[in-house]
Regions:
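Switch/connector loops and helix/strand junctions flanking conserved nucleotide-binding motifs
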Residues: 1-4, 271-274, 304-310
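Conserved catalytic cores of phosphodiester-cleaving nucleases, focusing on short active-site segments
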Residues: 228, 250-267, 281
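Mg2+/Mn2+-dependent nuclease catalytic core
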Residues: 267-284
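A short beta-strand-to-loop transition that corresponds to the Sensor-1 phosphate-sensing loop
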Residues: 1-4, 147, 266, 298-303
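Domain-level recognition of nuclease-like catalytic cores that cleave nucleotide substrates
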Residues: 286, 292-316
Length: 316
């Protein structure tokens, strides 16, 4: 068995990076009829269906210069089921993953990381000193960028299926322990936004936070930020939730077909201060040429009441 000492780990080699997935080239050639059939079933054009599949199942990179690959399990399930759903998480989120995140005190906002070395995530389980190797090797995180100068990697969620599935799995630890309550808040909030009833959305959010106020007791500002991070990012299953831009970002930017909502949140501050920060930091600038209505929402969280104290809504 001396040969076993000479095994070579090829998992980070560019030439093998697409061996376990389906590439865009394969999807648009060999599987093109399947994409067309799925698009017909969903009332989407070929290009629209391709984009939905990309957002939900693409995005895996397993080396420095890897091409994008799709999750084959979910992609094939989508073709067979004629629906774009979260199939991978339907198979169950391992309890040991959640326990590992708790063991290593991983905050949900810090799961996506920048500036890590290969030794931080491409190691065997017995050498783990953080949850990063487990998250990467089990497919919850993937390589998003590589910087040759520092030989560092940026890791992040590969796609919407994984991001939303992970956040839904973690939500009961921070929000209501009853998943249906959390999902109900998110879908109702989004419905209010589509109806352009931002007052209704904020009142619904305030009532929800009041209903879980016992879970918000003895929480600090960081915990408050985590709660809002989860709520707004869970909306990414239904609407576009913006990521950080070159000039920074507001706490939440939600894009609908005709309107863009920019939220800034304060903890024991004032809603006016929140609006002022949106203007001072230029959070609206990236969206001024979008042709959509811009709406600013300044929100203040009252730690004594353990819910939203006030909010102010203004057109951009």
């Amino acid at each position: 068995f001396s040969e076993l000492n000479n095994l070579e780990n090829i998992s980070m080699f560019d030439q093998y990076s697409a061996i376990c997935g389906i590439s865009m080239t394969e999807l648009t050639s060999v599987m093109k009829p399947d994409v067309e059939g799925l698009g017909d079933a969903l009332g989407l054009t070929y290009d629209e269906c391709l984009e939905e599949l990309r957002l939900y199942y693409d995005g895996y990179h397993f080396s420095k210069h890897s091409e994008d690959v799709f999750n084959p399990f979910s992609l094939i399930r989508a073709m067979n089921g004629q629906a774009i759903e979260s199939y991978w998480f339907g198979s169950g989120t391992p309890s040991y993953l959640i326990k590992s995140l708790q063991k290593y005190h991983v905050n949900v906002m810090d799961i996506e990381t920048k500036g890590v070395t290969i030794d931080d995530f491409d190691v065997s389980p017995e050498q783990m000193t953080s949850a990063l190797p487990l998250l990467y090797q089990s497919g919850y995180l993937t390589i998003k960028a590589y910087k040759p100068l520092t030989k560092s990697y940026q890791l992040g969620y590969p796609n919407n299926e994984v991001r939303i599935g992970m956040l839904r799995s973690l939500a009961p630890n921070y929000l209501s322990p009853v998943s249906i309550d959390n999902n109900g808040l998110v879908t109702e909030f989004v419905d209010f936004l589509y109806d352009e009833n931002i007052e209704g959305a904020m009142n619904r959010l305030k009532a929800y936070l009041s209903s879980i106020s016992n879970r918000l007791s003895n929480k600090n500002e960081r915990d408050f930020q985590t709660v809002f991070y989860l709520i707004f990012n869970l909306m990414g299953a239904f609407i576009k939730v913006e990521e950080e831009s070159a000039i920074g970002r507001a706490d939440a930017v939600l894009q609908l077909p005709n309107t863009i909502y920019v939220f800034e949140l304060k903890y024991d501050g004032s809603a006016e201060d929140a609006l002022r920060q949106i203007d001072d930091k230029g959070y609206l600038i990236p969206y001024t040429a979008s042709g959509k209505k811009l709406v600013k929402v300044g929100v203040n969280y009252d730690s004594d009441q353990r819910t939203i104290g006030e909010w102010i809504i203004r057109k951009g």
